[in-house]
Amino acid sequence: MKEDKVLILRTCANNMADHGGIIWPLSGIVECKYWKPVKGFENGLTGLIWGKGSDSPLSLHADARWVVAEVDADECIAIETHGWIKFPRAEVLHVGTKTSAMQFILHHRADYVACTEMQAGPGSPDVTSEVKVGNRSLPVTDDIDATIESGSTQPTQTIEIATYGSTLSGTHQSQLIAGYGSTETAGDSSTLIAGYGSTGTAGADSTLVAGYGSTQTAGEESSQMAGYGSTQTGMKGSDLTAGYGSTGTAGDDSSLIAGYGSTQTAGEDSSLTAGYGSTQTAQKGSDLTAGYGSTGTAGADSSLIAGYGSTQTAGEESTQTAGYGSTQTAQKGSDLTAGYGSTGTAGDDSSLIAGYGSTQTAGEDSSLTAGYGSTQTAQKGSDLTAGYGSTGTAGADSSLIAGYGSTQTAGEESTQTAGYGSTQTAQKGSDLTAGYGSTGTAGDDSSLIAGYGSTQTAGEDSSLTAGYGSTQTAQKGSDLTAGYGSTSTAGYESSLIAGYGSTQTAGYGSTLTAGYGSTQTAQNESDLITGYGSTSTAGANSSLIAGYGSTQTASYNSVLTAGYGSTQTAREGSDLTAGYGSTGTAGSDSSIIAGYGSTQTASYHSSLTAGYGSTQTAREQSVLTTGYGSTSTAGADSSLIAGYGSTQTAGYNSILTAGYGSTQTAQEGSDLTAGYGSTSTAGADSSLIAGYGSTQTAGYNSILTAGYGSTQTAQEGSDLTSGYGSTSTAGADSSLIAGYGSTQTASYHSSLTAGYGSTQTAREQSVLTTGYGSTSTAGADSSLIAGYGSTQTAGYHSILTAGYGSTQTAQERSDLTTGYGSTSTAGADSSLIAGYGSTQTAGYNSILTAGYGSTQTAQENSDLTTGYGSTSTAGYDSSLIAGYGSTQTAGYNSILTAGYGSTQTAQENSDLTTGYGSTSTAGYESSLIAGYGSTQTASFKSTLMAGYGSSQTAREQSSLTAGYGSTSMAGYDSSLIAGYGSTQTAGYQSTLTAGYGSTQTAEHSSTLTAGYGSTATAGADSSLIAGYGSSLTSGIRSFLTAGYGSTLISGLRSVLTAGYGSSLISGRRSSLTAGYGSNQIASHRSSLIAGPESTQITGNRSMLIAGKGSSQTAGYRSTLISGADSVQMAGERGKLIAGADSTQTAGDRSKLLAGNNSYLTAGDRSKLTAGNDCILMAGDRSKLTAGINSILTAGCRSKLIGSNGSTLTAGENSVLIFRCWDGKRYTNVVAKTGKGGIEADMPYQMDEDNNIVNKPEE
């Protein structure tokens, strides 16, 4: 039991504010910051102790909040008002209605010890005595003790305040306040406040506040606040706050806050906050915060924060933070943070951080961090960090760090670190570190370190270290260290050390050491030491030592010693010694001695002697003598003599004679004669003649003739003729002719013809013809023709024709024709034709034709034709045609045709045709046709046709046809036709036809036809027809027809017909017909407005307004207004107003008003008013008023008023009033018909003396 506490009762405003502006909480502590222990209500909190005393300070408004709070008795001060005390702080225990608050005090007072003597402070009066004195007491609280003693309960109290047309249903202790037309239903102890037209349903202990037109459904203990037109549905304990037009659905104990037009769906224990127009969907325990226009979908216990326009999808227990326009998708337990425009996809328990515009895809337990514009893809357990614009792909449990613009691909359990712009590829368990712009490729468990711009490729368990720009390739278990710009290739378990710019190639178990710029190649277990810039090649178990810039090649068990810049090649057991810059090649057991700069090649048991700078090559038992700088190669038993600087190679029994500086190579029985500086190689029994500086290689029985500086290589039976500086290689029985500086390589039975500087390579039975500077490679039975500077590669049975500077690559049986500078790649049986600068890639059996600068990529059996600068990508069995600068992407079996600069993307079996600059996207089996600059997007089985600059979007099985500059959007099974510049939006199964510049919007199953510049909006199942410049708006199942420039608006099930320039507005179930220029307005029970000479026809309860010369027909309770010379007809209770020369006809209880020379007819109880020279006829109990010279006729009990010259006729008990004008004022002459009066049913007039007389018969 509480001994030092008391309960107080007080009221607050609906927003929980007290008279001093302090906001009281719904529960918990409230404190006054300006507390002063003086009497009076100011500078403190106040309340009625135990709920007994004066109720004058309490608010009795229906929306007041009744508060019960607990106060420390030692802090209380009694004030003058009976029962009221003042205190600095309190704890709110209950907030509800008056009844619920009193019930709370009654049920809990027993928990407190009543204080009989209580002082709040020095000089303060006795609180208890103050309570006992009091003025008047609360009626309810006066019975507290009696209620407790009797054990009775409080009666049910419901407060309902509503305006007309509303329906309120409240149960025990509920409060309902609503505007007109609202429907409110409340459970126990609930409070509902809503604007007009709203619908509220609340469970027990709920609070609902909403604007007009809103719909709220709340479980027990819920709180909802929403703007007009909103829809809120909440389960018990939920708290929803939303702007106008929003939709909120919440599970138990959820909190939703959203801007106008938003849509929120939340499971239990969720918290959602979003800007206007956003969409949020969350499972239980989620927390979502998003900007306007965003879309959030979250699993249980997730937290999402995103900027405007973003899209977030999260599994349970995920956290996402993203900038505007971003897209995030995550499985449970993930944490994503990304800048605007980014895309993040994460598996379970992953963490992603990325800058704007980045793309991240991660498996479970991954951590990705990337700068803007980067792309990261990782399997589970990976850790990636990369700069902007980088690309990272990682296997499970990998770690990647890279600078901007880098590309990383890693297997599982790998670690990669790279500078910007680098490329790294590694298998599992690898560790790569590289500078910017480097390329690293590593096998399992390898370690790579490289400077910027380097290239490293390593097998498993390798260790590579290289400076910038180096290239290293190693098998497993190798250790490579190289300076910048070096190239290293190593077999397993090798050790290589090289200076910068060196090249090393080693077999297993080798040790290579080289200076910078050197080249070393060694087989297993070799030991090579060379200076910088040297080249070494060694067999097994060899030892090579060479100075810088030397070249050494040794077989096993050889010993080579050479000065710097020398070249040595030796077989087993050889001993070579040469001066610097020399070249030595030795067979087994040979001995070679040469001066500096010499070249020697010897078979076994040979003896070579040469001056400095000479080259000698000899088979067994040969004797070679050459001058300085010469080169000699001899078969067995050969004898070679050459001048200084010459090169000779001879088979056995050969005779070689060469001038200084020449090179001769001959098989047995050959005879070679060459000028100075020439090179000749001949098969047996060959004859070679060459000018100075030429190079000739021939098989047996060959004839070679070459100009100075040329190179010729031929198999047996060949005939080669080439100009100076050319290179020719020919198979057997081939014929080659080439200009100066060309390179030709041909298999047997080939014929090659090439201009100067060209390169030709051909297999058997090929025919190649190319211009100067070209490169050609051909399979068997191929035919290639190419201009200067081109590159051609062809499989067998291919035909390639290319302009200068082009590149062609083709498999067997292909036919390629391209312009200069183009690039073509073709599969078997393909045909490619392309202009200059184009790029073509085709699968087998494809046909590609492209203009200059275009890019084409196609799978098998495709047919592509594009203009210059275009890009085409096609699946198999596709046909693409596009103008210059276009981009085409097609699935299999598609047909695409596009003008220049267009973009086309299509799934399989599609047919697209578009003009230049257009953009088309189509699902499978679609047909699209569009003019230049148009944009088309279609789902499957759709047909779209559009003029230039148009935009079309359609779902499946739609048919759209639109002129240039138009915009069309259609649901499935729709048909749209529109002129240029039009805008069309249609639901499914709709048919829209519109002229240029028109705007049409329709729900499903509608039919719209409109002229140019028109605007049409239709509900479902409607039919609209309009001329140009018209505006039509209709509800569902309406039929509207209008001429040009007209405006029609109708509700559901209406029929409107109007001429040009008309304006018709109608409610549901209306029928309006008007001529041109008319203005009709009709609602349900209709209202029409039309111009002159109009015809209006409407049903009951209608209002018609028309100009002169109009014809109006309406049912009962209608209002008709028209100009002069009109005809009006209405049913009972009609109101007719017309100008002069009009005819009005109406039923009973009608009111008719017309101008001069009019004819008015009405039923009983009617009122007729007309001008001069009119005829008025009415039934019983009617009132007729007319001007001069009129005829008034009515039934019994009627009142007739006429002026000078008028004739009045009425039935029994009627009143006739003649208004007589004497020049100064009117005088009324009154007569009654029937008993005591004049005779009824007789026509009366006034004579000159103002007497009532019978009208004489005419």
Swiss-Prot record:
Q: Return the Pfam families for the record.
A: Ice_nucleation
Chain positions covered by the region annotation Disordered: 260-287, 311-342, 356-383, 407-438, 452-480
Q: Where found in the cell?
A: Cell outer membrane
What InterPro entries does the entry give?
Ice_nucleatn
One example of the protein's molecular function in GO is:
ice binding
The entry's cellular-component GO terms read:
cell outer membrane
Region Octapeptide periodicity: start-end pairs: 162-1217
Q: Which keywords does this Swiss-Prot/TrEMBL entry list?
A: Cell outer membrane, Ice nucleation, Membrane, Repeat
Where composition is biased (Polar residues), the residues are 261-286, 311-334, 357-382, 407-430, 453-480
Q: Which domain of life is it from?
A: Bacteria
Function comment: Ice nucleation proteins enable bacteria to nucleate crystallization in supercooled water.
Question: What is stated as this protein's family in its record?
Answer: Belongs to the bacterial ice nucleation protein family.
Q: What is known of its domains?
A: Contains 126 imperfect repeats of a consensus octapeptide A-G-Y-G-S-T-X-T; further on a 16-residue and a regional 48-residue periodicity is superimposed.
Extra remark beyond the main annotation: A structural model is suggested in which the ice nucleation protein displays a symmetry related to that of ice.
Q: Which PANTHER family match?
A: KERATIN-ASSOCIATED PROTEIN 21-1-RELATED, PTHR31294
Q: What is this protein called?
A: Ice nucleation protein
